[in-house]
């Protein structure tokens, strides 16, 4: 049973999506991107003003080069994150964002959307122990080590989580923890692959918990879901990892939100994304009620959701690029 607040959040998310879909239907080809943008406003507790958001996206387009990735629909993702975090100062912050991106490229990051998303994580981060340059360097070192550990599972869509792991200057130690989690999860029946790879990185961000405890929590959540619905796809493994940030996540509530979204005509064919959105909405409820403030996990969860949504966006981008390549042959 959904609480009144969660029901209202879900309705608000649906209304933001409906407005975006109506007004951007010829500009954004993937409904999933609009879904992620809509949920980001709810998770971050920001009011949505379409005109301000659209003006910002237009400003971005007019202030980048002709061949920039941001000339495409990706500018809307960037606009949403800048709008959420900086609102009326977003346009002034845009140049700082571009400076951060260019600095990352100079260090060796690729010129692609995932570096833009990583620059946003750096720009909106709240780390008190690591400056941006240190985190850039550590993030790149973490990414390079990821490739050494799992060459075929690692691509630039892993860069946002690599940057997050590098936040406190202990990224390589965190990556060792991630590798332990990966092997333990595989030994406990989880399917090896890119999604389990993402899970291990999300779990490793929880520095105060041992790998065995984190893997046990993942397994319990997985079992709770499979008791209620059919076997969970590996696509959803990263969402299970997000739920481990809570001591006792209520899986039934997450599934209730998912069911409510599944019943919406607009989301009828988006069942996999609906579960991902439901997890974000459920976590935002705990964040909003300050249940995590004292544990210091509030900012961590907020940022990990952002990184996870960046990874989801990355997956959508990758599938689009693959289809375009196929079409061109």
From Swiss-Prot:
InterPro entries hit by this protein: DUF4003
Domain of life: Bacteria
The protein, known as: Uncharacterized protein YeaA
Natural source organism: Bacillus subtilis (strain 168)
Organism lineage: Bacteria, Bacillati, Bacillota, Bacilli, Bacillales
